[in-house]
């Protein structure tokens, strides 16, 4: 039951953060996928969360030619999250969230360049594509790191509450 609630909460947070007005690339999406990689031991659940939330939000904001690269970038974020635990240190979460944002940046901008419509299909064109993507990267990195720290901290606190409530219930029942 807990996995269903966590999945549903993450799905709603991811979709809504993408649909409400926001700064370019400043959404919960990356943090949700990093967290999903850490939280769900069954990797198919993380993948289902990613695909469903992206497809639903893309249905509303529009499908586009860069979708394969964007989805691949988000898949990389799940892969980075696999190396984290819900109780990972803040420093580790910060470092891995930054690495995930960087992976997304490199993959998604490579996809934009491969499309061949905005930049020359040369090394210089690739570098130009990455340079032009830097303003988007900073916003995403700040969002991914900040939202990841928040999600992991929230999960730590909520998971700490569950055993405490279970122990309190056992104590009350044993007093009778």
Model feature map: region roles:
Residues 1-38, 45:
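Hydrophobic transmembrane alpha-helices
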Residues 2-6, 42-48, 67, 87-91:
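Membrane-helix interface segments
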Residues 10, 30-34, 70-78, 145-148:
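Alpha-helical transmembrane segments of multi-pass membrane proteins
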Residues 10, 46-56, 93-101, 168-170:
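Central hydrophobic cores of alpha-helical transmembrane segments
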Residues 16, 36-42, 79-88, 153-162:
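Structural signal for the C-terminal ends of transmembrane alpha-helices
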Residues 16-27, 51-84:
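Interfacial aromatic-anchored transmembrane helix boundaries in multi-pass membrane proteins
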Residues 50, 69-109:
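Short helix-perturbing small/polar motifs within transmembrane alpha-helices
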Residues 90-165, 173:
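Membrane-embedded alpha-helical hairpins and interfacial helices in multi-pass inner-membrane proteins
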């Amino acid at each position: 039951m807990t996995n269903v609630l966590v999945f549903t909460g993450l799905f709603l947070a991811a979709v809504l953060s993408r649909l409400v007005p926001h700064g370019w690339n400043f959404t919960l999406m990356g943090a949700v996928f990093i967290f999903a990689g850490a939280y769900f031991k069954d990797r198919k659940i993380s993948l289902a969360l990613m695909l469903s939330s992206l497809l639903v939000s893309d249905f509303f904001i529009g499908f586009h030619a860069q979708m394969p690269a964007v989805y691949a970038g988000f898949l990389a974020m799940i892969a980075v999250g696999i190396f984290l635990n819900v109780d990972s240190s803040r420093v580790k979460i910060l470092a891995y969230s930054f690495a995930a944002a960087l992976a997304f940046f490199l993959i998604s901008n490579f996809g934009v360049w491969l499309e061949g419509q905005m930049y020359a299909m040369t090394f210089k064109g690739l570098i130009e594509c990455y340079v032009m993507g830097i303003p988007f990267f900073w916003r995403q990195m700040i969002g991914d790191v900040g939202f990841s720290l928040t999600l992991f901290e929230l999960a730590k606190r909520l998971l700490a509450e569950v055993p405490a409530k279970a122990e309190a219930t056992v104590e009350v029942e044993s007093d009778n």
